[in-house]
Amino acid sequence: MPTIEHSYGDLNGGRWRAGNLHTHTTSSDGQRDHQAVIDDYASRGHGFLAISDHDIYTSLEDYEQYDARDMILIAGNEVSANGPHMLHVGATGFVEPHAERQRVIDDIGINGGFSLFNHPNWHANFNHCPHELLESCQGYAGLEIFNGVIRRLEGSPYGTNRWDMLLTQGRRLWGFAHDDSHAAVGDVGLGWNVAYVRDESPEGVVEALSQGRFYASTGVVIDKIAVDGQNIAVQTENAARIVALREGAKRFAHVDGPSIDVEVPEGARYVRFECWGTGEAFAWTQPFFIEA
């Protein structure tokens, strides 16, 4: 009997908290200072936030001068120079933006954080991050499957095609959604991650995200994710359709409604779910990996 390995197996002793890991301030190319950015996210009910200025590390000590507004603030930055952009989340110090991105990934890991690749389908050629690099690098947590700012730039804000190609190759990677906010108006509240956090501290948020105990969203709320034998159930507040996909991004089931309960198809190597709401509201579960 195949085994379903997934990140939602122990949802006890914590609570779901929404947050964003990709945002900019006037320290790099953002239009607002740190406190204005923090205030905006807090006013929208976010539970955690990372300031990720380009190659400018924001430490936990740096945050002490600001009012966190009851949010958990996460150290990090966007590694930008010398190659495709990456998020550095939760490490204890600045990491040099080496052109060899594997070295960046390794240095972040050594310093207690995790890394992910940003907006892979940015630019007119949809290739900000060459796929060969995504395939060759090891030890990163995942990639942005949605990046809000790319909606108004060239390329696609979505990266699920890259995700599915990597998952189909057997990689175990998480999908993240972020604002990548820069502008003073219109860049916040586009994409976020909803993590099940047990320890409400920076370390606790980093642990939840690095272990994949979250879903990515642009507006759909997931209420329940459960595995029972060979069946997976997803229940939402506001999805109009839920689609189940397997390797190669092949759809094997869908339901027009807010919930779905499907049996894992024979021979599947992974399964994931996309929850479609109205307009541009989506939610994406993390993959369920099938081991024979």
Q: Model segments located where?
A:
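A metal-dependent hydrolase metal-coordination microenvironment
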Residues: P2-P120, A124-G139, I145-M165, Q169, ...
